[in-house]
Amino acid sequence: MLLNSLSTNFAALEVGQHLYWQIGNIRLHGQVFLTSWILLGSLLVFISLGTKKMENDPKGLQNLLEFLWDYIRDLARTQIGEKVYRDWMPFIGTLFLFVFVSNWGGALIPWRLIKLPSGELGAPTADINTTIALALLVSLSYFYAGLSNKGWRYFEYYVHPTPIMLPFKILEDFTKPLSLSFRLFGNILADELVVGVLVFLVPLVLPIPVMFLGLFTSAIQALIFATLAAYYIGEAVEEHH
């Protein structure tokens, strides 16, 4: 009886107050969609302004966008390899930009101060559903990369360099998305909570240094996520000898 009560209580635990959208029998976290649309819309406007008038001598936003392009290209080339990195640049770039914008949106925008009829807004990456979805997308991508480049030979990876590695390699397929999702979720949620508490207690000066620290850690987390995604894809397409 006690165990059932405890399990029910733990199952009911939630981080923050959610804005729910009911579609048939499916209940969605509406705040994730709202903040994602706002941030992605802002990103599209930013990119549109930066590419509106392309010049041979880039300045301003165009210069920043070209820097990001070169950075993502070098990241993909280093982690995935010269042979197929171009095929995966759009995916790695999209992952990096989405996570980066989501993280920075959580650090810069006081979402929780925006009043809703129910629930509260927050960074998309501060919701475990978002980070798990991103991590599963990465897992599907490196499976696809391995199978599309090697065919059935991809499964040789699981017994390389010895068949003893098979259970460990299978276990690794489960730990990769778990570590990706919980690392990102934990860091961004912790940053949001710390800033939120400080804004409530000392609303003027003290939260500012913490916000700058949050911007730094948010950028690092986006870089780590994109780098690991590229590394896993590179590992899947790598030829084992």
From Swiss-Prot:
This is ATP synthase subunit a. The chain crosses the membrane at residues 30-50, 91-111, 128-148, 193-213, 214-234. It is found in: Cellular thylakoid membrane. It is a multi-pass membrane protein. InterPro entries: ATP_syn_F0_a_bact/chloroplast (IPR045082), ATP_synth_F0_asu (IPR000568), ATP_synth_F0_asu_AS (IPR023011), F0_ATP_A_sf (IPR035908). F-type ATPases have 2 components, CF(1) - the catalytic core - and CF(0) - the membrane proton channel. CF(1) has five subunits: alpha(3), beta(3), gamma(1), delta(1), epsilon(1). CF(0) has four main subunits: a, b, b' and c. It holds the Pfam family ATP-synt_A. GO terms for cellular component: plasma membrane-derived thylakoid membrane; proton-transporting ATP synthase complex. Key component of the proton channel; it plays a direct role in the translocation of protons across the membrane. One of its GO terms (molecular function) is proton-transporting ATP synthase activity, rotational mechanism. Keywords: ATP synthesis, CF(0), Hydrogen ion transport, Ion transport, Membrane, Thylakoid, Transmembrane, Transmembrane helix, Transport. Belongs to the ATPase A chain family.
